[in-house]
């Protein structure tokens, strides 16, 4: 006998009290929402101009190690940058759910809902699961009393692709803010900066490592190394956005909007 999906039913009921909003501008989604999750204006501004195609990140732009692959839904620019900062620093935590829904559609090909605010339908993997666990990157400075953005993204993705979430990673040393550091300094700052809690056993597991932004790749790589040391044999890093130079075609379209 099929049991009802109580979480899905609760989401549908919550739509009447707390309407879903566009992850980029915050507007309440109407019947004209594109793919059920983005207002038409932001679809033109973000999804048509800032989507990272293909999602896989080139190693020439990053300094990856200990990872099998890395993917992102968007380039870190414009409306996407605004949405991430509003979530991380502005306390608008609801944006993490909406951005995770976009990740599911753009990275893993989930079927977008045709009804505004409804969750996208993940395509069930055939045979063995795509990932055994989803693991969030531990945030350096989460807002007081809140989960960090990577954990919020991981929880939503766990629902969408039906994969359990683990949070075994922790920082082993004080970390400097990465923003002002050079590429070499970022790598040194993150070297041996993470470990898995004692007793964590990921032997033979495929792990999806989730962060909000991938810049040099220093953070996700250092986390991946810790997961490897706990036994993980295949690790994919995924983020809402990646910091890379925009392709020339996107640079031109972005300049036209200014």
Descriptions of predicted regions:
Residues 1-211, 215-258:
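Glycine-rich phosphate/pyrophosphate-handling loop used in enzymes and phosphotransfer proteins
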């Amino acid at each position: 006998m099929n049991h009802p999906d109580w979480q899905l039913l609760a989401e549908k009921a919550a739509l009447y009290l707390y309407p879903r909003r566009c992850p980029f501008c915050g507007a309440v989604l109407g019947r004209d929402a594109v793919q059920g999750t983005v207002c038409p204006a932001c679809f033109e501004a973000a999804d048509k101009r800032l989507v990272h195609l293909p999602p896989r990140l080139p190693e020439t732009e990053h300094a990856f190690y200990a990872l099998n692959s890395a993917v992102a839904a968007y380039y870190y620019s414009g409306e996407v940058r605004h949405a991430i900062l509003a979530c991380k620093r502005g306390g608008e935590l609801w944006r993490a759910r909406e951005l995770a829904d976009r990740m599911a559609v753009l990275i893993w090909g989930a079927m977008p809902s045709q009804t505004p605010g409804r969750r996208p339908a993940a395509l069930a993997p055939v045979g063995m699961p795509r990932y055994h666990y989803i693991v969030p990157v531990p945030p350096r400075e989460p807002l007081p009393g809140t989960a960090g953005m990577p954990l919020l993204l991981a929880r939503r993705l766990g629902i969408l692709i039906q994969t359990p979430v683990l949070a075994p990673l922790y920082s082993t040393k004080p970390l400097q803010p990465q923003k002002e550091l050079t590429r070499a300094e970022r790598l040194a700052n993150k070297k041996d900066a993470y470990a898995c809690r004692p007793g964590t056993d990921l032997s033979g597991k495929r792990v999806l490592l989730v962060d909000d932004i991938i810049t040099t790749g220093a953070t996700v790589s250092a986390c991946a190394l810790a997961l490897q040391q706990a036994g993980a044999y295949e690790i994919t890093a995924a983020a809402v956005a990646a910091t890379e130079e925009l392709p020339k075609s996107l640079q031109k379209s972005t300049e036209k909007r200014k």
